[in-house]
Amino acid sequence: MSRYTGPSWKQSRRLGLSLTGTGKELARRNYVPGQHGPNNRSKLSEYGLQLAEKQKLRFSYGLGEKQFRNLFVQATKIKEGTLGFNFMVLLERRLDNVVYRLGLATTRRQARQFVNHGHILVDGKRVDIPSYRVDPGQVISVREKSMKVPAILEAVEATLGRPAFVSFDAEKLEGSLTRLPERDEINPEINEALVVEFYNKML
């Protein structure tokens, strides 16, 4: 299954989750597209609930199914902690996500584009792989030639707050993942146990 590239507003309504992080998609119509009002949502089966939760998490990070599943498999090999939380931490450590968390992009999709286009450095070296896994303490910065890219500057200016697990210097356009996030700091609307149950049946 390829990565979804359609309208994020319609997909957000289908999932009941803001994919842009603004919440605007759900402000007027918080029911799925095609429904005639919010009271016509059909009741989901156990499998349907698990699938829906998996899709919410997958679309939140903008990943294709194969890439998402492979990351879950990697999480199963981590000995400490719970599987669901370990999986979410791996998602958070993706370079495109860290760029988004730092406020260098307004959405994860935009952050992925910035990485792909070579605008982002890790410890002073250009990395154009969105799935690159960031370690705490590594410095994420904007390439000198890209420091005046309007979209990057606009994103930084529009960012009102950042998670406690990152630090950022707006003048230098650089920051870092200072530590791994705690569970209550990421995606509180996600029930990762349902995602684990879904893949336990599939793998």
UniProtKB/Swiss-Prot annotation:
Part of the 30S ribosomal subunit. Contacts protein S5. The interaction surface between S4 and S5 is involved in control of translational fidelity. InterPro entries: Ribosomal_uS4, Ribosomal_uS4_bac-type, Ribosomal_uS4_CS, Ribosomal_uS4_N, S4_RNA-bd, S4_RNA-bd_sf. PROSITE patterns: RIBOSOMAL_S4 (PS00632), S4 (PS50889). GO terms for cellular component: small ribosomal subunit. It comes from the Bacteria. The keyword rRNA-binding applies. Coiled coil: none annotated. This is Small ribosomal subunit protein uS4. Pfam families: Ribosomal_S4, S4. GO terms for molecular function: rRNA binding; structural constituent of ribosome. CDD domains: S4. Keywords: Ribonucleoprotein, Ribosomal protein, RNA-binding, rRNA-binding. Residues 93-156 form the S4 RNA-binding domain. The gene is rpsD. The keyword Transmembrane helix does not apply. One of the primary rRNA binding proteins, it binds directly to 16S rRNA where it nucleates assembly of the body of the 30S subunit. Belongs to the universal ribosomal protein uS4 family. GO terms for biological process: ribosomal small subunit biogenesis; translation.
